[in-house]
């Protein structure tokens, strides 16, 4: 079984972390940063899950985003990427979604037992989009 969380809500991950599943599951948590210029992914395989290492990995990036988006009154209405007032474009969300599907699929195919956490950033050169690059990768277990 695969559980995919796209809420970007720590309380959802906390619920998953406090649950002791009877069967093995793969859990994928996928979220984007403000403006959808970064993608945060963590994947785990097991029946108990711990997101503390993931929180520690993404925390500096989230803090940096708050500084970049000081002009926004946070938290604000429409905080999710699904909302029309989210400060990111739909094509940025599509790129993040497509990347996430590929990462999740590769993780499942590999039958990995390790926790995999990734941070992607959009790369541009001279104002031209080039790619999504992995800027942080951690494997545990």
Language-model region placement:
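Receiver (REC) domain switch-region micro-motif
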Residues: 3
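Glycine-rich phosphate/adenylate-binding loop
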Residues: 6-141
